[in-house]
């Protein structure tokens, strides 16, 4: 079989203990359909098939997609040779589960796709770059737009660290498992999302600036007005965007 393709960000993981751990984190039952993104050689696919009713494996690499079905004859595996960003998630049953070892270059797009989909998964388990996993699960004091964007839709927690040397070829950095349990109701109402993110982006556009400056320039509001607004919400104008909780941003957005 051909080796990993650098252009597709492919890194093979064959450590059985880690693969079992990733599959276990998803809480898969015998009734579940699992969407696997980028199954590669099928090492994780094997663990998913042991647990799930069905696995839908979306693989961009035509060579790998062609070979995968032959590795698992007589199973409930469906292989789709397609870019996950163009895959219609509405084709999946409700409450499906996503498990994936995701190429680093496409991580943010995949998270956005899944968390904002009309047919959202119940649980998302991703093996991604360690730094990105930790940013997703950040708390006030270390927040980012990525963390806010994920956490309004899901409860995020971290799983195990997977050292780079366990992959073939080894990536330049370690990876980490991150688990997103989708919320029944997003923290921000759909009708308020546009306003909410306009304000959050204004705060983070110059993340090292204090809020009085970043919100003033980003929202085109005078600094005294920003200070009064923040004070009314119990927020210091000397704080930075990374210091605020999602609830803080929700409180601020209600005045717009």
Question: Over which residues does each language-model region extend?
Answer:
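C-terminal lobe and adjacent flexible extensions of AdoMet/dcAdoMet transferase-like proteins
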Residues: 200-256
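Catalytic cores of RNA-modifying enzymes
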Residues: 1-202, 231, 242, 251-252
């Amino acid at each position: 079989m051909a080796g990993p393709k650098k252009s597709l960000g492919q890194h093979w993981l064959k450590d059985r203990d880690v693969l079992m751990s990733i599959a276990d984190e998803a809480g898969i039952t015998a009734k579940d359909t699992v969407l696997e993104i980028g199954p590669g050689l099928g090492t994780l696919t094997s663990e998913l098939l042991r647990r799930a009713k069905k696995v839908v494996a979306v693989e961009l690499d035509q060579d790998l997609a062609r070979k995968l079905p032959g590795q698992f004859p007589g199973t409930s595996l469906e292989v789709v040779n397609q870019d996950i960003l163009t895959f219609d998630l509405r084709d999946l049953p409700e409450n499906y589960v996503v498990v994936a070892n995701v190429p680093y270059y496409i991580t943010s797009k995949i998270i956005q796709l899944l968390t904002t989909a009309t047919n959202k998964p119940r649980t998302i388990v991703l093996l991604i770059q360690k730094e990105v996993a930790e940013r997703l699960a950040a708390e006030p004091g270390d927040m980012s737009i990525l963390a806010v964007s994920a956490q309004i839709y899901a409860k995020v927690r971290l799983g195990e660290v997977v050292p780079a040397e366990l992959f073939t070829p080894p990536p330049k950095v370690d990876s980490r498992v991150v688990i997103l349990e989708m919320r029944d109701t997003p923290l921000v109402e759909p009708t308020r999302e546009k306003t909410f993110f306009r304000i959050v982006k204004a705060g983070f556009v110059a993340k090292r600036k204090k809020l009085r400056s970043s919100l003033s320039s980003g929202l085109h509001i005078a600094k005294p007005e920003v200070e009064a607004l923040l004070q009314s919400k119990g927020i210091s104008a000397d704080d930075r965007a990374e210091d605020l909780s999602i609830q803080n941003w929700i409180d601020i957005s209600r005045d717009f």
